[in-house]
Amino acid sequence: LSDDYIGQNAMNVLGTSSYGLYVKDASEEKNNYIGTQNIFASYMMVDMPLAEKLRFIAGARIESTSLFVESDDEGKDIGKLTNLDILPALNLTYALTDKMNLRTALSRTLARPTFRELAPFASEDFAGGEVKVGNPKLERTLIDNLDFRWEYFIKSGDLVSLSAFYKKFTNPIEVVDNPV
């Protein structure tokens, strides 16, 4: 977006005497795409005390995902993801006192590519002018999480905690700079 289109210079560029913002649609028909995403999921959980001060929570989310992106530009690859994922979560909490806990948790989460990341064409970022090209071969990212936390409940609604965590990413979705 150029300064020529904002403020006093807009009169010279646009041939009008009004101030404002001018946006020109320079997109091409071939850069259109159709995308659909369906996610069907269920969740189950158990929360049970193991001892007076020890609590165990386990759960799993099961997701069936279908993601499809097709460009209007014939000859381009079709972006498609079809996955069935089981995402477990385990949590163990030990009550040191009635106001203090030690907690450890293990879980698996995921991140899916957006339609634009999966769509097989170049798009220009409106604000910065940066051109990004989607990759129809992207896969979803699986993330394994491990957390340790000390919690101190000062009063109702107030919490002080100290945490440490570890994350492992499988098939991370990353932006790659490829200058022309």
Give the label of every model feature segment:
Residues I39-A95:
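Surface-exposed extracellular loop regions of Gram-negative outer-membrane beta-barrel proteins
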Residues T82-R103, S107, W150-I154:
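Transmembrane beta-barrel strand/turn architecture of Gram-negative outer membrane proteins
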Residues F68-G75, F115-F121, G128-E130, I173-P179:
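Outer-membrane beta-barrel translocator domains and adjoining extracellular loop/strand segments
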Residues L1-N32, V180:
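Flexible glycine-rich, low-complexity coil/linker segments exposed to the extracellular/periplasmic environment
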Residues S27, N31-N38, L110-F169:
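Outer-membrane beta-barrel signature, preferentially recognizing the C-terminal barrel domain
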